[in-house]
Amino acid sequence: KVLLFFGMIKKVKGLDVLLHALKDVVKENPDVLLLIAGKAWENDFTNYQRIIDENNLSDYCLLHTKFIPHDEVEHYYCAADLVVLPYKKIYQSGVLVMTLSYGKPALVSNLPPLKEIVTDMQTAFLFESENSISLAEKLNLILLDPEKLEQVRINGEELINTEYDWNEIGRQTKQAYQSLY
């Protein structure tokens, strides 16, 4: 199974939490691969590389730590079985919306802005933010249940194609303006 961490790599995105979780996940799921795709903030991947090295995770990590041009984004999503967003702090997530629009299931931290979009075990999977044990447990649970993974994937794709469809957004915006008069 391929796990995808996608986007700008900053401390608030929680890649360190995911890497610490990965060391426990590979014990039960040695065939898992974490694809890290995105440019490191200020070109500094040092802390993450140290975690990978100290925990012997290099065989389980595929690093594409560079800017990903728009025309290459689809390749990364096509390779992924699950997209992981272990954010520590966030106000909104374009990556979550993009993940669901590509028809991929997402595992996200339980921050309020993310919980406004998805529901645990229905349209995505949630874990306790900044908790690598919670993340590892949820990853192992997901990897053991491919049927649930597929159902959540379908539900997430349906959510994005209905609630976040441009026509629906336009209808809701029009309705909001009309309610002012």
Kindly label every feature range from the protein language model.
Residues 120-121, 125-132, 141-147:
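Conserved acidic donor-binding segment of nucleotide-sugar-dependent glycosyltransferases
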Residues 75-91, 104:
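Acidic donor-binding loop of glycosyltransferase active sites
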Residues 99, 105-108:
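Short hydrophobic beta-strand element within catalytic cores of glycosyltransferases
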Residues 46-67, 71:
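Nucleotide-activated donor-binding/catalytic signature segment of Leloir-type glycosyltransferases, i.e.
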Residues 1-13, 19-22, 35:
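Conserved donor-binding/catalytic core segment of Leloir-type glycosyltransferases
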Residues 98, 111-121, 125-126:
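Short acidic/histidine- and often glycine-rich active-site loop of Leloir-type glycosyltransferases
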Residues 6, 33-47, 66:
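Glycosyltransferase donor-sugar binding loop
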Residues 134, 141, 148-163, 172-175:
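A short, well-ordered alpha-helix in the C-terminal region of glycosyltransferases
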